[in-house]
Regions:
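Cytosolic regulatory regions of ion transport systems
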Residues: 1-286
Length: 286
């Protein structure tokens, strides 16, 4: 990918070059000068692992949502949320929301009901319990916007991660660095990798074992976990461990799923949020 950008620049004079780079050492800030017109002419770098880690991090900040995206440099948020039966906006025409909440900067973009997408063009549509709704709002109004859907969950204070690969390590590092007073536990099946993580993660407690083993989940305090995140390299393990974690007491479960056909099934099974690396990478490029 890096060489392809060089060829596009040198031979074809392509104005914008975007490269997917997965090998994490290439992303170290000390090599920032490497990506310049005089060196490797890459304008934008996409790291699938970093993008997935950021997506999960957003889920931890807004646990009531199934999808969260930052926009305009973090000044706005695009959020996907499921309507609760006790939401105050149930059976209210969308165009009336401005009258009900005049100080709330929020726009409903789409409503998904029974797998069918509806764009509320005239504002006459009404939301029903179980609808999956996408809206955009000012970041400072996010908590109030979530409250209108009866979601007032606080930022996760205890997180259990299944999978200690690149994504799991980056997510644990992100939580250690940017989440205050959040307890992090991580389950990794490979013993040598678990030792590596234990040596490199300062505040994360590492458990060597199988995330599908109920005894390991219990040892990792799954019963008191607010958010369980499954980011192994196996879709089946991610889905099943997320369901097992919820059955054993985890309040919220997020699963990494690579196979697109699995995504609608996972939500129906009871997993709260699904992260798809391909969708996230394409979204980042766009």
């Amino acid at each position: 990918n890096m060489v392809a950008c060089q060829v596009a620049h040198t031979i074809f004079n392509t104005p914008v070059k975007i490269a997917r780079i997965r090998h994490q050492p290439y992303l170290d800030p000390i090599y920032g000068d490497l990506y310049s017109p005089d060196q490797l002419p890459i304008d934008h770098i996409i790291s699938p692992e970093a993008e997935v880690s950021a997506a999960v991090s957003n889920q931890l900040r807004v646990p009531g949502a199934f999808d969260v995206k930052d926009m305009c440099g973090g000044r706005m948020n695009l959020v996907g949320v499921q309507c609760s039966e006790v939401s105050p906006i149930i059976d209210t025409p969308i165009r009336h929301l401005t009258n009900l909440f005049p100080d709330l900067s929020m726009t409903i973009l789409a409503v998904i009901r029974d797998g069918k997408l509806t764009l509320p063009r005239d504002g006459a549509e009404m939301m029903k319990p179980g609808d999956r709704v996408y809206f955009v709002c000012d970041s400072e109004h996010l908590d109030r916007a979530m409250a209108t859907f009866a979601h007032e969950e606080h930022e996760a204070r205890s997180v259990l991660i299944a999978g200690g690969g690149a994504i799991g390590q980056m997510l644990a590092t992100e939580i250690e660095t940017n989440f205050q007073n959040t307890k992090v536990h991580l389950i990794e099946r490979n013993a040598s990798r678990a030792h590596f993580l234990a040596e490199n993660l300062r505040e994360t407690r590492i458990f060597n074992g199988d995330a599908l083993d109920s005894s390991i989940l219990a040892e990792a305090d799954v019963g008191t976990t607010e958010t369980f995140v499954a980011v192994t390299d196996d879709d089946e393990v991610n889905i099943l461990s997320a369901l097992l974690a919820k059955r054993n007491g985890a309040a919220h479960a997020v699963a990494l799923v690579n196979i697109p056909g699995f995504i609608p099934l996972v939500a129906a099974l009871g997993v709260d949020a699904v992260i798809n690396p391909s969708q996230i990478t394409v979204s980042s490029i766009l």
